[in-house]
């Protein structure tokens, strides 16, 4: 894990190495979940590129997520510091009890370990999320991995899951599958 001082950082928190929120995985190959730092932007970008069918955003967008939205995002790294998992999202300004999960990516080496769920739960159990009682995301109808993840989260959190069409193919330029808005909640973050 490479953490350096970022001279532009308004907060001393960003200048410190990130402490792992959780250590997951097997004893022989642990994974560390923590808030992202500016040094993680390119690694996040590369991870998402390696995880089709995820939409790849610009490296700049991932740098912004790693700095401006770091309290609502998480990365998972292996012992070598390689980013093998990422979750991004934000608390909605018009609904401060709702976290909108934008993207979850898990690299091939870490798939099948429950890392996606652990990344989401690492974010949801942070003190910054104490007032959050709903999680929203969008999922294409055929993304079975994402549907499975969010159904498992709803079951674990003992919360209802509802969905409805949100963005049509036409709204997405005709080249993208429609996106359903999925909502889990209400739930209590202190019971996750």
From Swiss-Prot:
A GO molecular-function annotation: diaminobutyrate acetyltransferase activity
Keyword entries, A-Z: Acyltransferase, Transferase
InterPro entries found in the cross-reference section: Acyl_CoA_acyltransferase, Ectoine_EctA, GNAT_dom
N-acetyltransferase domain segment(s): 31-192
Biophysicochemical property: temperature dependence: Optimum temperature is 20 degrees Celsius.
EC number of this enzyme: 2.3.1.178
The protein's annotated pathway: Amine and polyamine biosynthesis; ectoine biosynthesis; L-ectoine from L-aspartate 4-semialdehyde: step 2/3
pH dependence: Optimum pH is 8.2.
Family membership: Belongs to the acetyltransferase family. EctA subfamily.
Chain's role: Does not acetylate amino acids like GABA, L-ornithine, L-lysine and L-aspartate.
Protein name from the UniProt record: L-2,4-diaminobutyric acid acetyltransferase
Source species: Halomonas elongata (strain ATCC 33173 / DSM 2581 / NBRC 15536 / NCIMB 2198 / 1H9)
Protein's gene: ectA
């Amino acid at each position: 894990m490479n953490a350096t001082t970022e001279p532009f950082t308004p907060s001393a928190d960003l200048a410190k190495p990130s402490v792992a929120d959780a250590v997951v995985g097997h004893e022989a190959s642990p994974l560390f979940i923590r808030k992202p730092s500016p040094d993680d932007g390119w690694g996040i970008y590369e991870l998402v590129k390696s995880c089709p069918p995820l939409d790849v955003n610009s490296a700049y967008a991932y740098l912004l997520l790693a700095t401006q939205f770091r309290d609502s995002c998480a990365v998972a790294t292996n012992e070598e510091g390689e980013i093998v998992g990422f979750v991004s999202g934000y608390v909605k300004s018009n609904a401060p009890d709702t976290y909108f999960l934008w993207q979850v990516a898990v690299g091939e080496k870490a798939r099948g370990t429950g890392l996606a769920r652990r990344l989401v739960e690492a974010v949801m159990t942070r003190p910054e999320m104490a007032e959050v009682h709903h999680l929203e995301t969008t999922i294409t109808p055929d993304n079975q991995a994402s549907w499975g993840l969010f159904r498992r989260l709803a079951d674990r959190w003992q919360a209802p899951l509802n969905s409805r069409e949100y963005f049509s193919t036409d709204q997405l330029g005709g080249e993208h599958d429609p996106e359903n808005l999925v909502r889990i909640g209400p739930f209590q973050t202190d019971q996750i």
